[in-house]
Amino acid sequence: MSISLKKSGMLKLGLSLVAMTVAASVQAKTLVYCSEGSPEGFNPQLFTSGTTYDASSVPIYNRLVEFKTGTTEVIPGLAEKWEVSADGKTYTFHLRQGVKWQDNKDFKPTRDLNADDVVFSFDRQKNTNNPYHKVSGGSYEYFEGMGLPDLISEVKKVDDNTVQFVLTRPEAPFLADLAMDFASILSKEYADNMLKAGTPEKVDLNPIGTGPFQLLQYQKDSRILYKAFPGYWGTKPKIDRMVFSITPDASVRYAKLQKNECQVMPYPNPADIARMKEDKNITLLEQPGLNVGYLSFNTEKKPLDDVKVRQALTYAVNKEAIIKAVYQDAGQAAKNLIPPTMWGYNDDVKDYTYDPEKAKQLLKEAGLEKGFTIDLWAMPVQRPYNPNARRMAEMIQADWAKIGVQAKIVTYEWGEYLKRAKAGEHQSVMMGWTGDNGDPDNFFATLFSCAAAKDGSNYSRWCYKPFEDLIQPARATDDHNKRIELYKQAQVVMHDQAPALIIAHSTVYEPVRKEVKGYVVDPLGKHHFDNVSVE
C-alpha cells in the first residue's frame, strides 16, 4: 500500500470518527425547563416548596411508593409490594433488589439500596438523637406538621429487603403519605461517610438518590444541570440531559419558550394565555388545579385573635374582582380550603359575600370602629395558586382601606419569606397549596391542625379543638363515607372561624413546545420529565 493510500485511509478513518462523534452529540437529547426559582436545597425532607421538589425529589430521589404520573394513584416504587395488618397499624414493605445509588466526587456507593436506607431516612426526621436530625437546620415541616412523630411508633428493619412501619393508630391516608416528597429515601452509606468526614451537610447539598436523573451542577439563581442516571432501576429517561434555566419572570420565561431556549415553562402570566393558545409552536395544556390560594391570619397576634376581626377582613375583600384582575378569570373564587374537584367538598357552605358595611359593623363590635394597621405579606414568586401576589396584595390593601384598616405590604426573597413566616413574624401572609396526595387530610391537617400550628406549616397558628375533633377521627377511620361527613363538618367550622381568607382555586396551564412529547400535567403540581422526549 502506498503512503498516499495510507494517508487517505487514515483521513477516511478520522472523518468517520468525527462523523460518529457529531452524530452522537446530535443524538444526545437535552431538555431545558425554565423553572420559576431557585431550590431552597436538595433534600426534600427539609422543605415544602414545589420549586424545591421539582429540583430534588422528582428527578433525583424515589420513595417506597409513588404516584402514577398525572394521577393520584399509588403504585409500587422502591417497594415492589406491601401488606397491611388487619388492625391497620402495621405496614410491611418488600424492597426491590438491585436498585443502584448515584455517585459524586465525594462518594462511590459500595452496595445497593437496602432496608438500612429506609430506616435512616425516617429516623433522621423522627429521632432527635439521630446525628443527622439537626443538620441543615433540622426542620422537618411536613413530617412534624402531619403529626408523624406521634403516629409512627417504629420503623424497623426485618431483613435487608424488608421494612416494617408500626403505627400507634390506623391512618387512612398513610400509604399515600409515603408517596409524598418528604418520604424520599436517602443513602445511609453516604450519610455515614459524610458524617465521618465532618461534612454531614453535603448530604443535603450534593444529593445522592436512586431516581432517573443525577445532579451534575448547580449555579444558584442561574441553572441546574442533570444527566440521565445510567444505573436507574426504572424505565430509562428518553432525554440524556436536563437543564433547569432559573427564570423568575414569567414574561421572560415565555420569551425563552418562543425562541426555543427552553421547551417547557411553568406558571405563565394569565394575560399571555390567549397568545399561547394561538401560537402554533406551543401546546398549551390545562386542567383544574388541585390547589388553593389563601391569606393566613396569625391568630396569635392581636387583633387577629378575635374571630370578628377575621370575619370583617374576609367580608371586606372583593374576591370576584381578584379572580378577574389577578387570575384573568382562569380560576374560581374559593369558599372552602379544598377544591371542588376533591372528594369531601362541602358545596352547602355559603361563601362570605363582598360586604364592606358588614365588615365595618363587625369591627365596631370588636371595639375597632376606627380601624387598625396590619402587615400584609406578599410572596415574591408566581405559584400555580397565585399568579401575581403583588397585584393581589394591592387589591386587598385597597379593599381593607375602605373599612379603615391600613395594610403595609411586605415581601422577602422566597426562602427568607418561608423561613420568617414559619417563625410567625407576620400578621397576615399570602400562602397557597397544591395537594400532595389527593386526600383532604393533606389540606386540613397539613395546613390547619394543631400539630401544624406547632411545627410551622399552619401559618395561621390556629389550634381549635372543635376543628381538631373532626379532622383527627377522619384520619383514623377507613370508612370513606364517614370521612366525607367529618370533612364536610370541618369545612363549616373553618368557614365560621375564618383563620384564613380563602381566595381562589386556579386553573393550571402548562405551555410546552410542540417538539416535546409525552409531557403530562401533574394534578399534584410537580414537573416530571423522565418519560418526556424532544423531537
Language model segments and positions:
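N-terminal lobe/hinge region of extracytoplasmic solute-binding protein
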Residues: C34-A86, D123, I208-T210
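Surface-exposed binding/hinge segments that line
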Residues: S2, H94, N127, P131-A191
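Ligand-site clamp/hinge motif
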Residues: E201-D204, F229-R275, A393
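Detector for C-terminal structural segments
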Residues: T30-L31, S35, A55, A172, ...
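Gly/Pro-rich hinge or "lid" segments in bacterial periplasmic/extracellular proteins
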Residues: K68-T69, D150, D160-N161, E171-P237, ...
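Aromatic- and charge-enriched surface segment that lines or borders ligand/interaction sites
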Residues: E80-P131, Q164, P303
